[in-house]
Regions:
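N-proximal helix/coil linker or "cap" segments that precede and/or mark the start of modular domains
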Residues: 173, 179-222, 232-235
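Short solvent-exposed coil/turn linkers within tandem alpha-helical repeat scaffolds
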Residues: 79-90, 99-103, 112-126, 133-140, ...
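Bacterial N-terminal signal peptides
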Residues: 11-21
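Short active-site neighborhood of thiol/selenol oxidoreductases, capturing the structured segment around
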Residues: 229-246
Length: 246
């Protein structure tokens, strides 16, 4: 397997890990369902998902103008404009942006996202929408720009650190490892002893030791039988690595 293929496989794996990590983080606790407006917004979202599922099953393309996601994106955005600053509005904002991504309207989503103030609570979930859009188009420039701004000016500390580590991951996915390193180091320094710092430390270790094309670290050991083994001894030979945990 040549280096180009290895790099491609590594890139695909990194992208999958990137999305899975962010999706895992997204499993935060939803707002308490004691607000009728939350129920109202959730009902709209449920109906949008139902109609979107029917649209997909019909074989229609996401970019078609009759995609119901477009209709519901408009409806949810209108709700946002009429009810600013509420928990329900934060959810409506995120879902409106997400539906535009699902309808392949990335530019329109970005235009609307630019109207969401950096101090809004909606960013706690809306960042995931930007990640999804970036992964779909394999274009991380907008995600980098927005998370960079949020990491500097967001009011909510959780949004701020989340934006910062997402910024590092976006740089990493784009292939700008030095910029990613700087972002991850900032997370470790500014948010010590947090899950985000632990994740950033793990990412830094991968950048340092596991990037394709890097020189493998030298080592010399003995087997359980007492035979010497060293890296140079494997040159030109097929090697099977077996890992196990205890």
């Amino acid at each position: 397997m040549n280096r180009k293929i290895i790099a491609q496989l590594f890139g695909s794996l990194l992208g999958l890990m990137f999305l899975l990590t962010l999706m895992t983080r997204a499993q935060d606790k939803p707002p308490k369902p004691d607000d009728p407006e939350l129920d109202r917004v959730q009902a709209m979202i449920s109906q949008a998902k139902k109609e979107s599922g029917q649209f997909s099953k019909s074989g229609s393309k996401a970019s078609e103008p009759n995609n119901p996601n477009l209709k519901w994106a408009v409806t949810l955005w209108e709700y946002r404009n009429k009810h600013p600053g509420t928990p329900a509005t934060a959810i409506a904002t995120t879902e409106a942006l997400r539906l535009l991504v699902r309808a392949d309207r990335i530019s329109e989503m970005q235009t609307k996202a630019d109207t969401v103030k950096l101090d809004e609570a909606a960013w706690k979930r809306a960042i995931y929408v930007l990640v999804e859009a970036a992964a779909n188009k394999k274009d991380y420039n907008y995600l980098i720009s927005k998370t960079q701004a949020l990491s500097q000016t967001a009011v909510d500390p959780e949004i701020k650190v989340f934006a910062h580590i997402t910024l590092g991951e976006a740089y990493w996915k784009k292939g700008e490892t030095e910029q990613a390193r700087v972002a991850f180091q900032a997370v470790v320094a500014q948010y010590p002893k947090t899950p985000y710092a632990e994740e950033a430390e793990g990412n830094l270790m991968e950048i340092e030791l596991l990037n394709p094309g890097q020189t493998a670290p030298q080592f010399a050991r003995t087997t359980i039988k007492g035979d010497p083994i060293f890296l140079a001894g494997f040159k030109g030979r097929v090697v099977v690595l077996k890992f196990w945990g205890t």
